[in-house]
C-alpha cells in the first residue's frame, strides 16, 4: 500500500514541477517580448532625437494636444476667480503650520485651499466642491490645526470618511501638518479591534478620524467617550458617504453632537440634491468654495481607450503591463473575484502585483497599500473601494479592466493618477458590452476618448501563453475557495455587518 501511495505522490510532484516549469517558460516568453518592445522604443527615441529639425507626424499631434491643454487651462483659470496666494505665509497661520507646510514641500495653496482656508480661518462653515486630487484634505486640516493651536482640548475635531483607507490617509495628513504642534490623533474604523480603539480614545486625542459606522459604535458603547464639546465636524467625500448609504448613521451622529459652537465643513466632488439636503441639516450660513461644479478631470491626465475583441481582455492587460514595465500602475476591476484573479495571474507571470478589495481584512489591506506605496509592488489591482481618497503621489498609469457603471466612478478612478500637478495616463479596456457605458462617460467629459496605439501582432503572440496561465490561476483560486468553505471562514453578526458597511463594497 505504501509503495502505491509513494508512486502517486511522486507522480503529482512531477506534474507540479512540470506545470511550474511551463509557467516559468511562459513568463520568460512574455518578458522577452517586453524587452524586445523596450529596445524598439529606445531605438525609435534615438531616431526621433536625430530628426529634431524634421518633426514627425506624432510630434505635430502632440503639439496640438498641448495647445488644447493650454486653452482648457485658460478656461479653468477664468472659471476660478478669487484671491490667489504665492505661499502659505500669505495666509494668517501660526508659524508652526507654515513651517510644517514648508517641510512637506507645499509650495503654495492649491485653488481649493486658496478659496476655502481664508473664510474657514474667519470661522465660517464651508462647503468645498473640488475635483479629486486637488488638495482638499489640507484645505480643512490647516484651519482646524490653526484654531487648535490657540484652544487645545481633547476631542476637538471629528472627520468622517467613507472608507478605512481614506480615514488613514487623513490621519497621516493631520499628523504631518501637526508635527510641530504636539497634535494627537486617532483613526477609528471598522475591521479593527474595538478595545484597542477604546484605549486610543481614552488617551484623549485632539483629532478623531472615523468611518461613520465605527464612530457610532463607540459613541454608544465606549464608556467615557463623548463628543459633547466637539468644535469641528468634517464630512469628507460627502457624496460617497451618502452613496454608501451612511445617511441614517450620519443623521444619528448629527443628533448626538452639539450644534452650538460647532464649525462644520462639508467637502464633495459634486453638489447633488442629497448633498444639498445634508448641508441644510448640518451647516449654518456656509461659504461655498467651488473650484469645479461639474465632472471633470485634470489637464495633466491623458485618457485613452482600447476596443478589445471578445476573449482577449486578459491578453491586452498583460500586454499593457509589459509596455509599462517600471511604471506604477493601478488596475481597476468591478468585482473582488476579478481583482484576486488578475493579481494572481500577474504574479504567476512574474509581474509584481498586490490586491486591494473588501474580502481582505484591515491588516491585509494596509499591507497591500504599504507594499505599493513603498515601491515593493509596482501594480495595485483594486476594486472601487480604492478609487476614492487614496493619495498615492506617484501613480503613473490607471487601467480600467472593467468599465465602471457610472461616470462618477470613472472620474474618481482616473483621479488616482495625475495628482497635484503631475502628469498621468488612464487606459480603458472597452468590450462590445461596454460601448454604452463609455458613451455615457464621454458625454459627461464633453469629449471623445482617443484610441490607444497598440501593436496587435504583439498582442496576438501573447494570447496562448496568457490563456494557459489564466487557466492555471482559475484552478488555483477554485482550490483556495474550496479550502475556505471547508474551514467555514468568516464571523457574522451585528459587528461584522457594520464592518462590511465600512468597507464600501457590497
From Swiss-Prot:
> Could you state one GO cellular component term attached to this entry?
cytosol
Q: Which family does it belong to?
A: Belongs to the DEAD box helicase family. DDX47/RRP3 subfamily.
Residues holding ATP: 130-137
Q: Where in the cell is it found?
A: Nucleus
What range does the record give for the signal peptide?
A: none
Task: Sum up the protein's function in the record's words.
Answer: ATP-dependent rRNA helicase required for pre-ribosomal RNA processing. Involved in the maturation of the 35S-pre-rRNA and to its cleavage to mature 18S rRNA.
Start and end residues of each stretch annotated as Disordered: 1-22, 37-88, 485-506
Motif Q motif in this chain: where? 86-114
Q: What are the entry keywords? A: ATP-binding, Helicase, Hydrolase, Nucleotide-binding, Nucleus, Ribosome biogenesis, RNA-binding, rRNA processing
Source taxonomy lineage? Eukaryota, Fungi, Dikarya, Ascomycota, Saccharomycotina
Recorded hits in InterPro entries, A to Z, give: DDX47/Rrp3_DEADc, DEAD/DEAH_box_helicase_dom, DEAD_box_RNA_helicase, Helicase_ATP-bd, Helicase_C-like, P-loop_NTPase, RNA-helicase_DEAD-box_CS, RNA_helicase_DEAD_Q_motif
Protein's UniProt name: ATP-dependent rRNA helicase RRP3
Pfam families with a match to the protein in the record: DEAD (PF00270), Helicase_C (PF00271)
Amino acid composition bias (Acidic residues), ranges on this chain? 49-69
Amino acid at each position: 500500500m505504501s509503495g502505491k501511495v509513494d508512486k502517486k505522490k511522486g507522480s503529482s510532484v512531477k506534474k507540479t514541477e512540470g506545470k511550474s516549469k511551463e509557467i516559468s517558460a511562459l513568463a520568460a516568453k512574455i518578458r522577452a517580448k517586453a524587452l524586445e518592445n523596450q529596445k524598439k522604443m529606445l531605438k525609435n527615441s534615438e531616431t526621433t532625437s536625430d530628426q529634431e529639425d524634421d518633426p514627425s507626424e506624432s510630434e505635430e499631434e502632440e503639439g496640438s494636444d498641448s495647445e488644447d491643454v493650454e486653452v482648457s487651462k485658460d478656461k479653468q483659470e477664468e472659471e476660478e476667480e478669487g484671491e490667489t496666494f504665492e505661499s502659505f505665509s500669505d495666509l494668517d497661520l501660526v508659524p508652526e503650520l507654515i513651517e510644517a507646510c514648508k517641510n512637506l514641500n507645499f509650495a503654495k495653496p492649491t485653488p481649493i485651499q486658496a478659496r476655502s482656508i481664508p473664510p474657514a480661518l474667519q470661522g465660517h462653515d464651508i462647503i468645498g466642491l473640488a475635483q479629486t486630487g486637488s488638495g482638499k484634505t489640507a484645505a480643512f486640516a490647516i484651519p482646524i490645526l490653526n484654531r487648535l493651536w490657540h484652544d487645545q482640548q481633547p476631542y476637538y475635531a471629528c472627520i468622517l470618511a467613507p472608507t478605512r483607507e481614506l480615514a488613514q490617509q487623513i490621519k497621516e495628513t493631520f499628523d504631518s501638518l501637526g508635527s510641530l504642534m504636539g497634535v494627537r490623533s486617532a483613526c477609528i474604523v471598522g475591521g479593527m479591534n474595538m478595545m484597542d480603539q477604546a484605549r486610543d480614545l481614552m488617551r484623549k486625542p485632539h483629532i478623531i478620524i472615523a468611518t461613520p459606522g465605527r464612530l457610532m459604535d463607540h459613541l454608544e458603547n465606549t464608556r467615557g467617550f463623548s463628543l459633547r464639546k466637539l468644535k469641528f465636524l468634517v464630512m469628507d467625500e460627502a457624496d460617497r458617504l451618502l452613496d454608501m448609504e451612511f445617511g441614517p448613521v450620519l443623521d444619528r451622529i448629527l443628533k448626538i453632537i452639539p450644534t452650538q459652537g460647532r464649525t462644520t465643513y462639508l467637502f464633495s466632488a459634486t453638489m447633488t440634491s442629497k448633498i444639498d439636503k445634508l448641508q441644510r441639516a448640518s451647516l449654518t450660513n456656509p461659504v461655498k468654495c467651488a473650484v469645479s461644479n461639474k465632472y471633470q478631470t485634470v489637464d495633466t491626465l491623458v485618457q485613452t481607450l482600447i476596443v478589445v475583441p471578445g476573449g482577449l481582455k486578459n491578453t491586452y492587460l498583460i500586454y499593457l503591463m509589459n509596455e509599462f514595465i517600471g511604471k506604477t500602475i493601478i488596475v481597476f476591476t468591478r468585482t473582488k473575484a476579478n481583482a484576486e484573479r488578475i493579481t494572481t495571474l500577474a504574479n504567476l507571470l512574474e509581474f509584481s502585483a498586490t490586491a486591494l478589495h473588501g474580502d481582505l481584512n484591515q491588516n491585509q489591506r494596509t499591507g497591500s497599500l504599504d507594499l505599493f506605496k513603498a515601491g515593493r509592488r509596482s501594480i495595485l489591482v483594486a476594486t472601487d473601494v480604492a478609487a476614492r481618497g487614496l493619495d498615492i503621489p506617484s501613480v503613473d498609469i490607471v487601467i480600467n479592466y472593467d468599465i465602471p457603471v457610472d461616470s462618477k466612478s470613472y472620474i474618481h478612478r482616473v483621479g488616482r493618477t495625475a495628482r497635484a500637478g503631475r502628469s498621468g495616463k488612464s487606459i480603458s479596456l472597452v468590450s462590445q458590452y461596454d460601448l454604452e457605458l463609455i458613451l455615457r462617460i464621454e458625454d459627461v467629459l464633453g469629449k471623445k476618448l482617443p484610441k490607444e496605439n497598440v501593436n496587435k501582432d504583439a498582442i496576438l503572440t501573447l494570447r496562448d501563453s496568457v490563456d494557459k496561465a489564466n487557466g492555471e490561476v482559475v484552478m488555483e483560486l477554485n482550490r483556495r475557495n474550496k479550502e475556505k468553505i471547508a474551514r467555514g471562514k468568516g464571523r457574522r453578526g451585528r459587528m461584522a455587518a457594520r464592518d462590511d458597511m465600512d468597507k464600501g463594497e457590497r
